[in-house]
């Protein structure tokens, strides 16, 4: 494995040619303050102890690494292990980062938070930590996503957050990020922007990756305990890329195949997809340079996925870099492939995954049978499917797989 891989952003915040700080001048003081505060917190054993305390006592970490015996047998394939981020408090990986950033904001003396959310999971995680630490929170959420995720909207409001509907553009995650950034610019003195994915201006991609890396660190120690060796392949779904970077990062310099699974929506032969790597090109959005779905004139295109958490038109700068150097392989799954995998997996394992996670499972169902039965695959179940029950029900009813 190539040990020359760049695993930290350079002093200007770039991974290779991706990353940076493409923000208005008015935001630079806040960005500089955040970078300095994070560097100090990262080196402070007391901050790390506090983070570990809440991850253990509040979130419920470590999450299990479960051998999927029935699923493995049904595929007649390599051994499949599940990293159970669905078992975290709030039901997804998002809490790992929300908790870390809330502690950081508290350390910086910020009493208010602003966040964006797509599927609502990051919004719920942010509202949860805001309630825990007695902070005010404003969440921007696309109007389309609000329709798809009513349950999570109510959860956020019950937890005390103010949810603001974003009607601009497509009314999805990308538009919510725009509004959250605008809000931060005008409230920068007392507000921390709790960014939910591994993107945005430096130092956000690094901060989010570091707080999510607990996933990969646990996988490493758990698989060594269970199997006495590292896995042959690791698979995670990818939107902006936070669960995937947290899963992959501790293995970047190991001899382990890493697969990120993008959302192909209605198919990679249509324009209704979220294939930032698969069909995109480098560009700048939301303060960072990364792969984007854009036209020849550099206009960012609308992303589509049945999963509200994957319909983002970009993929974080570190993933963009790992794609270019060939360290991570990017595959995809369509809406139909993901839903079929979700139904199949649920029937075998008694675990209903989030539709996001089902994209990763769809690729596992293609990959695992091509490997030997002695091989080991780990797939990150990034969240549970409670939030998606209405979408799943509609999908099955429309296809005669369930009664209306």
Curated annotation (Swiss-Prot):
Superkingdom per UniProt: Bacteria
Complex and partners: Tetramer of two alpha and two beta chains.
Residues with N6-(pyridoxal phosphate)lysine modification: 94
Reactions catalysed, as given in the entry: (1S,2R)-1-C-(indol-3-yl)glycerol 3-phosphate + L-serine = D-glyceraldehyde 3-phosphate + L-tryptophan + H2O
Chain's gene name: trpB
Function: The beta subunit is responsible for the synthesis of L-tryptophan from indole and L-serine.
Name of the featured protein: Tryptophan synthase beta chain
CC terms in the record's Gene Ontology section: cytoplasm
Keywords: Amino-acid biosynthesis, Aromatic amino acid biosynthesis, Lyase, Pyridoxal phosphate, Tryptophan biosynthesis
Family that this chain belongs to: Belongs to the TrpB family.
InterPro entries: Trp_synth_b_CS, Trp_synth_beta, Trp_synth_beta/beta-like, TrpB-like_PALP, TrpB-like_PALP_sf
EC number: 4.2.1.20
A matching Pfam family: PALP
């Amino acid at each position: 494995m190539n040990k020359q891989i760049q695993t930290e952003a350079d002093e200007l915040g770039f991974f290779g040619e991706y990353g940076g700080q493409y923000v208005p001048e008015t935001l630079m003081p806040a960005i500089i303050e955040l970078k300095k505060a994070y560097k100090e917190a990262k080196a402070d054993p007391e901050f790390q102890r506090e983070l570990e305390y809440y991850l253990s006592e509040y979130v419920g970490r470590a999450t299990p690494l479960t051998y999927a015996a029935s699923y493995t047998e049904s595929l007649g394939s390599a051994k499949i292990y599940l990293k159970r981020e669905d078992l975290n408090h709030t039901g997804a990986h998002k809490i790992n980062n929300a908790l870390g950033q809330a502690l950081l904001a508290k350390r910086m003396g910020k009493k208010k938070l602003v966040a964006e959310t797509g599927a609502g999971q990051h919004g719920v995680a942010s509202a949860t930590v805001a309630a825990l630490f007695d902070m005010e929170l404003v969440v921007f959420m696309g109007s389309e996503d609000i329709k798809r995720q009513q349950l999570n909207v109510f959860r956020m409001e019950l937890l005390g957050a103010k949810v603001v509907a974003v009607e601009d553009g497509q009314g999805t995650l990308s538009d919510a990020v725009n509004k959250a950034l605008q809000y931060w610019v005008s409230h920068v003195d007392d507000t921390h922007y709790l960014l939910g994915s591994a993107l945005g201006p430096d130092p956000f991609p690094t901060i989010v990756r570091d707080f999510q890396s607990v996933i990969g660190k646990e996988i490493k120690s758990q698989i060594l305990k269970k199997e006495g060796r590292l896995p042959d392949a690791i698979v995670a779904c990818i939107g902006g890329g936070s669960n995937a970077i947290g899963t992959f990062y501790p293995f970047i310099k190991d001899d382990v195949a890493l697969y990120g699974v993008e959302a192909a929506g209605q198919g990679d032969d249509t324009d209704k997809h979220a294939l930032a790597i698969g069909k995109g090109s480098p560009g700048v959005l939301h303060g960072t340079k990364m792969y984007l779905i854009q036209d020849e004139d550099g206009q960012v295109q609308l992303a589509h996925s049945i999963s509200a958490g994957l319909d983002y038109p970009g993929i974080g700068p570190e993933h963009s870099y790992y794609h270019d150097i060939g360290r991570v392989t990017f595959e995809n799954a369509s809406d139909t492939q993901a839903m079929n995998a979700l139904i199949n997996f649920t029937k075998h394992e008694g675990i209903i995954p989030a539709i996001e996670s089902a994209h990763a499972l769809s690729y596992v169902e293609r990959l695992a049978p091509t490997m030997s039965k002695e091989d080991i695959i780990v797939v990150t179940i990034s969240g549970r499917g409670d939030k998606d029950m209405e979408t799943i029900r509609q999908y099955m009813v429309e296809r005669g797989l369930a009664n209306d």
